[in-house]
Design a protein with these regions (language model features):
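Conserved non-catalytic scaffold segment of RNase H-like nuclease domains
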Residues: 1-129
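Metal-dependent phosphoesterase core characteristic of DEDDh/y 3'-5' exonuclease domains
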Residues: 2, 64-83, 104-203, 207-224
Length: 224
């Protein structure tokens, strides 16, 4: 069985036309109805709301961008590709396909298990969306429509209640695993990218992969 532990880092949309569209959809809260109150809201909060709307696209594959993909096969050392989205995705897909061919010799086969933290709702979906938008062929070795046993999401494994989901940092702490969070975390990726800190992002992404894999191994261990 091949296990692929996956983590992606994303950043907000940088396409001017799309940003204009996103900003055009910003509206005051529905509780504000009076004309003068709406005008006051725009004056006091409008610019911040526009910036927040663009920043939130880093969570949405429709508009956001992938800037780094970290991964590891089975117990192999974690790897990461960081850079322009199209190149990063193609490199990752090539590595996944090559690994499947090397392991199974005759033809690429599906990776049996994808492991990640919030991978079902975020990483895998975001990656699929970006590949579709960019017209990048998706390798058959990744189970895009994964069956339950092909997807091991440590967030869901710990607590399937979405209202009580746990962060990777917190899960690591309660399981006695070194947390990957330090000077850099997901909320700082956009600024790190803007500052050109690609190596730091890649290092952080690989640390996330290592931590996620360690959590998964502990969650699935039969030892007391």
């Amino acid at each position: 069985m091949t296990i692929l532990t996956l983590d992606i880092e994303t950043r907000p949309c940088d396409d001017p036309a799309l940003i204009e569209e996103i900003i055009s959809l910003v509206r005051p809260p529905r509780t504000i109805t009076r004309t003068e109150s709406i005008a006051a809201w725009w004056k006091e909060n409008g610019e911040a709301a526009k910036q927040e709307a663009v920043a939130r696209t880093s969570f949405d594959g429709t508009y956001g961008r992938i800037c780094c993909i970290g991964y590891a096969f089975d117990d192999s050392p974690a790897e990461a590709h960081c850079g322009e989205e199209d190149i990063v995705i193609r490199k990752f897909f090539f590595d996944v396909t090559e690994a499947a061919m090397v392991k199974h010799y005759d033809a690429p086969v599906k990776v049996h298990t994808i492991v990640g933290h919030n991978v079902s709702a975020f990483d895998l979906r975001f990656l699929w969306q970006r590949a579709v938008i960019l017209g990048i062929p998706r390798p058959q070795s990744i189970p895009w429509q994964a069956k339950p046993w092909e997807l091991q999401d440590t967030m869901v494994m710990w607590n399937p209640d979405r209202e009580k989901r746990i962060s990777l940092d917190r899960l690591c702490k309660v399981l006695g695993i070194k947390s990957p969070k330090g000077d850099l975390d997901g909320s700082k990726i956009a600024q790190a990218w803007a500052d050109g800190r690609h190596d730091d992002i890649a290092h952080y992404c690989k640390a996330d992969v290592d931590a996620t894999r360690a959590c998964w191994q502990k969650l699935t261990s039969s030892s007391a």
